[in-house]
Amino acid sequence: MQKGQTTPFAVRKMNSNKKKQLFILAALCLALLAGGVSLGFISANRTGQTVSLFVDADDTPDSVLYKVDEIGEPFSVLGLRGFMTVSRYGAHVHPGRYDIDPGTSIYRIFRRLRAGQQTPVRLVIPASLRTVEALAAKLGANLQADSAAWMALFRDTVALKEFKVDTSTLPCLFIPDTYEVFWTVEPIVVLRKMNKNYRRFWTDARLVKAREAGLSPYEVVTLASIVEQETANEAEKPMVAGMYINRLRQGMKLQADPTVKFALRRFDLRRILHEHLAVESPYNTYHVEGLPPGPICLPSKSSVESVLNYARHPYIYMCAKEDFSGTHNFAATYADHLANARRYSAALDSRGIK
């Protein structure tokens, strides 16, 4: 055998070593694959309840991993980092709110994050929100845009022209209900959604009733907001609405106590005194004639319907009942009204309410 020539035995030995190396490499790959798969099934939520993962516009893969680490099982971040690295997640960071149920796997949440499959926000607009500031705070607490961004839109006279409202009549567009939007939605998009819903609410039948009452849709909502604050008794709402419509038709000032509270921003007042009536404000209906320039709260649909279907009666006065039931005594004459007012005042005094 010449020098340097490989024997058949040596060739078989080399082939055997290569096979061993390939086997070990394959085993390692399978182990890594199995480990990756196992990591993919680790829960992204260890809290035992549904939690929301908020991804901001300036988040990076590392900051997302940090947020997941606060709620996920041990090693969940390791699995998520692997998926992010392989898929180049850094180029696909989608802002949004992602609700994670208990037991949701890292792989499943990764797929949602990479695809930007947000969880819709159930945005509840409650009745009786009193000011645009309170409305902005409510929206800012539930959506990505903060209250300052909402107030900037609410005061943007150019933007509001699209909806034919100003800051005073803007609340008319927000009909109390539950809406589905994404957390990242732009404020102007929400306003367009509210406007569309508002236009849908005002059917031909409702518009006819508004005209018969001598009111525009915005005026109906404004009067409904006063009714909303005057009584929580659903059966009494049409009576209250009818009383105010009677006063409007007779050219009388509304003299609605809730408008004084709104003008003062003193919503805790339990007793309106003469000193309170002196406030100079277009919302103080003891001073101004007709309706205030806009709603004093977001009225419920039932309050709006009570104005459209107001009770026909002769009453032009009302006073809270002395039994503090939340309902009212109605009167057609000032003398009867004074008698009702004296009884209520005496009841306040007896309870030490000032």
Where are these regions (language model features)?
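N-terminal amphipathic/basic-hydrophobic helices that include classical n-h-c signal peptides
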Residues: M1-K13
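Intrinsic structural disorder/low-complexity segments
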Residues: Q5-P8, I24, N340
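N-terminal type II signal-anchor transmembrane helix
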Residues: V11-T50
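Short low-complexity stretches enriched in small and charged residues
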Residues: K19-F23, T50-V55, A91-V93, E133-A134, ...
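Bacterial extracytoplasmic/cell-wall-associated proteins, especially those involved in peptidoglycan
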Residues: T60, Q144-A148, A159-K354
